[in-house]
Curated annotation (Swiss-Prot):
The gene is rpoA. Residues 1-231 are annotated as: Alpha N-terminal domain (alpha-NTD). Homodimer. The RNAP catalytic core consists of 2 alpha, 1 beta, 1 beta' and 1 omega subunit. When a sigma factor is associated with the core the holoenzyme is formed, which can initiate transcription. Keywords: DNA-directed RNA polymerase, Nucleotidyltransferase, Transcription, Transferase. Gene3D superfamilies: 5' to 3' exonuclease, C-terminal subdomain, DNA-directed RNA polymerase, insert domain, RNA polymerase, RBP11-like subunit. Its EC number is 2.7.7.6. DNA-dependent RNA polymerase catalyzes the transcription of DNA into RNA using the four ribonucleoside triphosphates as substrates. The N-terminal domain is essential for RNAP assembly and basal transcription, whereas the C-terminal domain is involved in interaction with transcriptional regulators and with upstream promoter elements. This is DNA-directed RNA polymerase subunit alpha. CDD domains: RNAP_alpha_NTD (cd06928). Pfam families: RNA_pol_A_bac, RNA_pol_A_CTD, RNA_pol_L. GO terms for cellular component: cytoplasm; DNA-directed RNA polymerase complex. GO terms for biological process: DNA-templated transcription. It comes from the Bacteria.
Length: 328
C-alpha cells in the first residue's frame, strides 16, 4: 500500500537575502527525517556534480617543472598556481581552450588579464592577484581552460600529448562556493514533529542560486528515477494502483470536508456540535471522545450516535487528518 506523505506545496525563497550570488530556500513541511535526507542530498550534488569552468594547466616560457622560480617575477610557480586555482569563469565553451598571454613589467598580473582568444569565456573575479612582474621583465604564459564537474586532481588533467613544460593544475570546476543545511521542527495542525529544511546556497556568479538548485534537483531526479521504475514483479506498483491510491486519498479528503449538517443526526447532537464550532466531519474525527464529553449538553447518548455515524464511513475519533488538509 502507498501512503500519502506530507510534502511542501512549493519551495519558498527568502527575498530579503536573495542576490545573484546567494539564495536561501525553505522547504516545509517534511516528514520527520526527510529534512536531513533531502538537505544532505542537495548539498552533495550542489558541491560535487554541477558543471563549471576552471584552469586545468599552464605553460610558462623558461619553466620546466612546477617548483621553479621565474626570473623577473616576484612569486614562484607554486604560488602562481595557487592563485590561478581561484580564478572563476562564466563560459560557453564545451571543450578545452588555450589562451596565450604576454605580461610586460612593471605589472600587477591579475585574473582580468586572462582574456579568451575567441571569446569562449569571461573572468568573473577580474581583480584577483596572480603575480607581480618586475620592471624590464616579461612573463609569457599559456593558460589552458577546461570544462568539467566538481573537482579534478592535477594528475587527471595531464593530456596524452603533453607539451614540454606543461604544468597540470587541480581544477575546481564547481560554481558553488558554499552550501549550508539547517533542519528545524515545524507545526502542521496539532503536530509539531514535522521538519523545515533551510538551504543556503552561495555561488561564484557563473550560475544563479535558483538555477543551481533546479539543476541539482534534476540530477537527483534522474538518478532516483531508476528506483522509481524498478519493480520486483510485474503485478506490483502498477500505474493503476498509483491512480487508485490517489483516488482514495481525494475521496477521503472530500469526505472529511463534508459538512456536519449533511449527516443524519438528531437536533440535539447538531446543536451541540454547532456550539462547539465543529463544522465538518474532519473537525469531528480530529477530536477525542473525552474532549467531546466536556462540551455543554453533550452526553454519552450523543457520543454513541456520532460513533455510529462515523463507523458507516470507517472513521473514528482521535484521527490524525493533517495529511489530508489543503496546503496554502
Amino acid at each position: 500500500m502507498i501512503y500519502q506523505m506530507q510534502m511542501p506545496a512549493k519551495i519558498e525563497v527568502d527575498e530579503t537575502t536573495h542576490t545573484d550570488y546567494f539564495g536561501r530556500f525553505v522547504a516545509q513541511p517534511l516528514e520527520r527525517g526527510y529534512g536531513v535526507t533531502l538537505g544532505n542530498m542537495m548539498r552533495r550534488v550542489l558541491l560535487a556534480s554541477l558543471p563549471g569552468t576552471a584552469i586545468t594547466g599552464i605553460k610558462v616560457d623558461g619553466v620546466f617543472h612546477e617548483f621553479s622560480a621565474i626570473e623577473g617575477v616576484r612569486e614562484d610557480v607554486p604560488e602562481i598556481v595557487l592563485n590561478l586555482k581561484k580564478v572563476r569563469f562564466r563560459s560557453t565553451c564545451k571543450r578545452s581552450c588555450k589562451t596565450t598571454l604576454t605580461i610586460t613589467g612593471p605589472k600587477d598580473f591579475t585574473a582580468g588579464d586572462i582574456v579568451a582568444m575567441e571569446g569562449e569565456f569571461d573572468v568573473l573575479n577580474k581583480d584577483l592577484h596572480i603575480a607581480t612582474v618586475n620592471e624590464g621583465s616579461t612573463l609569457n604564459i599559456d593558460v589552458f581552460v577546461g570544462r568539467g564537474r566538481g573537482y579534478t586532481p592535477a594528475e587527471d588533467n595531464r593530456p596524452e600529448s603533453m607539451p614540454i613544460g606543461y604544468i597540470a593544475i587541480d581544477a575546481i570546476y564547481t560554481p558553488i562556493r558554499n552550501v549550508k543545511v539547517a533542519v528545524e521542527n515545524t507545526r502542521v495542525g496539532q503536530r509539531t514533529d514535522y521538519e523545515k529544511m533551510v538551504l543556503d546556497v552561495e555561488t561564484d556568479g557563473s550560475i544563479t542560486p535558483d538555477d543551481s538548485i533546479s539543476l541539482a534537483g534534476r540530477i537527483i531526479n534522474e538518478h532516483v528515477a531508476f528506483f522509481a521504475d524498478f519493480s520486483p514483479t510485474e503485478e506490483e506498483f502498477t500505474e493503476e494502483e498509483f491512480k487508485q491510491q490517489d483516488d482514495e486519498f481525494e475521496a477521503m479528503r472530500k469526505l472529511l470536508n463534508t459538512k456536519i449538517e449533511d449527516l443524519d443526526l438528531s437536533v440535539r447532537s447538531h446543536n451541540c456540535l454547532r456550539l462547539a464550532e465543529i463544522d465538518s466531519i474532519g473537525d469531528l474525527v480530529s477530536r477525542k471522545e473525552d474532549e467531546l464529553l466536556n462540551y455543554k449538553n453533550f452526553g454519552k447518548k450523543s457520543l454513541t450516535e456520532l460513533k455510529e455515524q462515523l463507523e458507516k464511513f470507517e472513521l473514528k475519533f482521535g484521527m490524525d487528518i493533517t495529511k489530508y488538509q489543503m496546503k496554502g
